[in-house]
């Protein structure tokens, strides 16, 4: 059918991925100004924490939030044209994206309504994350194929661990951790979305390699049937993220909000689960891990000694307090994120 219509190229994953990426990017450029204007008219402005860097209270006041809406709109419209909508992995990732985005949307809305940075009750927020991660990981466990409960370790050719049904709580931990660490990192113009572009780009490569029997056999990594549609999904996410960065780069015209940050983190975590890259993901998302550890260390040490290890947490604020400009922090963190990604990808061959 495709051949008769002269659409043979639609059989190729690389072609569909390329155009899903370009399409999502162009949609973001076209609809970005309209969405920013609409959010401003609705007075959906970013609510800033009073305990953050003082200059943020003046520089970032009045910037519209909930920018995740722009990303997901562009991604979903693009995917409608380029992806197999009934692929099981796509449906699971789609559920994760929508459910965590709704949770983040509620959080953003409450912050704006109450005019403070508290948002959802922390207990309700974590319960929501537990519920959505439990549903999605359980779906993955039962519909994800024979390899799904096996964990593969970087650097080791034959070292693997089959968790069985315990993979469900393990996967939930990955999902919730990824979601919250991304949320913590979203504190400077372009920081979180730039780092997510690096992680997403690396996952595109991994997804493509695992979808091909020849590459998977050569690299001694699992061949995951159906993961080729994840290449297209990640491509669209990459394009939407680049489009969002166009408006989120310093000085930002729009902020991602929890609508975007909670969801993108969870989506990347779920993608890592599907691609059997759970341990590799910890290396790939190294900057996000460091940001989260800085908060955990800061809180734990302060509770015990009443002293601070960092001038301010998360880690990006520590460097701001040391005198780095916002753009210096962002670009240097991007560079570090890229190094982590290169290390992670290199482990595919070092086995």
Swiss-Prot record:
User: Which Enzyme Commission numbers does its entry carry?
Assistant: 2.7.8.13
**InterPro entries, alphabetized:** Glycosyl_transferase_4, PNAcMuramoyl-5peptid_Trfase, PNAcMuramoyl-5peptid_Trfase_CS
| Molecular function (Gene Ontology), one example | phospho-N-acetylmuramoyl-pentapeptide-transferase activity
Q: Which GO terms describe its biological process?
A: cell division; cell wall organization; peptidoglycan biosynthetic process; regulation of cell shape
Q: Does the keyword Metal-binding apply?
A: yes
> Subcellular location, in the record's words?
Cell inner membrane
Keyword Glycosyltransferase attached:
no
Which Pfam family is one of those matched by this entry?
Glycos_transf_4
Q: What is the recorded function of this protein according to its Swiss-Prot or TrEMBL entry?
A: Catalyzes the initial step of the lipid cycle reactions in the biosynthesis of the cell wall peptidoglycan: transfers peptidoglycan precursor phospho-MurNAc-pentapeptide from UDP-MurNAc-pentapeptide onto the lipid carrier undecaprenyl phosphate, yielding undecaprenyl-pyrophosphoryl-MurNAc-pentapeptide, known as lipid I.
Q: What is this protein called?
A: Phospho-N-acetylmuramoyl-pentapeptide-transferase
């Amino acid at each position: 059918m495709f051949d008769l219509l002269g659409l043979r190229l639609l059989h190729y994953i690389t072609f569909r991925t390329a155009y899903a990426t370009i399409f999502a990017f162009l949609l973001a450029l076209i609809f970005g100004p309209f969405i920013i204007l609409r959010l401003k008219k609705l007075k959906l402005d970013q609510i800033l924490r009073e305990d953050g860097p003082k200059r943020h209270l003046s520089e970032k006041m009045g910037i519209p939030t909930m920018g995740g809406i722009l990303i997901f709109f562009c991604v979903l419209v693009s995917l409608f044209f380029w992806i197999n909508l009934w692929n099981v992995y796509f449906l699971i990732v789609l559920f994760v994206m929508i459910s965590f985005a709704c949770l983040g949307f509620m959080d953003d809305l409450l912050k704006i309504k109450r005019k403070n940075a508290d948002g959802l009750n922390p207990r309700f927020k974590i319960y929501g994350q537990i519920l959505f991660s439990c549903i999605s990981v359980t779906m993955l466990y039962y519909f994800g194929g024979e390899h799904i409960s096996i964990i593969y370790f970087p650097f080791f050719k034959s070292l693997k661990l089959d968790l069985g049904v315990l993979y469900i709580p393990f996967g939930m931990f990955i999902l919730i951790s990824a979601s919250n660490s991304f949320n913590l990192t979203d504190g400077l113009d372009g920081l979180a979305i730039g780092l997510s572009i690096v992680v997403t780009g690396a996952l595109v490569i991994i997804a493509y390699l695992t979808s091909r029997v020849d590459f998977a056999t050569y690299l001694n990594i699992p061949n995951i049937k159906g993961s080729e549609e994840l290449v297209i999904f990640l491509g669209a996410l990459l394009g939407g993220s680049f489009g969002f960065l166009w408006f989120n780069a310093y000085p930002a015209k729009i902020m991602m909000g929890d609508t975007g940050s909670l969801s993108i983190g969870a989506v990347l975590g779920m993608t890592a689960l599907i691609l059997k890259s759970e341990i590799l993901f910890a290396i790939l998302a190294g900057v996000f891990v460091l940001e989260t550890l800085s908060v955990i260390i800061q809180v734990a040490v302060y509770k015990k000694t009443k002293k601070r290890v960092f001038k301010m947490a998360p880690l990006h604020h520590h460097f701001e307090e040391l005198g780095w400009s916002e753009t210096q922090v962002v670009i240097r963190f991007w560079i570090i994120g890229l190094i982590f990604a290169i290390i992670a990808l290199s482990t595919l061959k070092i086995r």
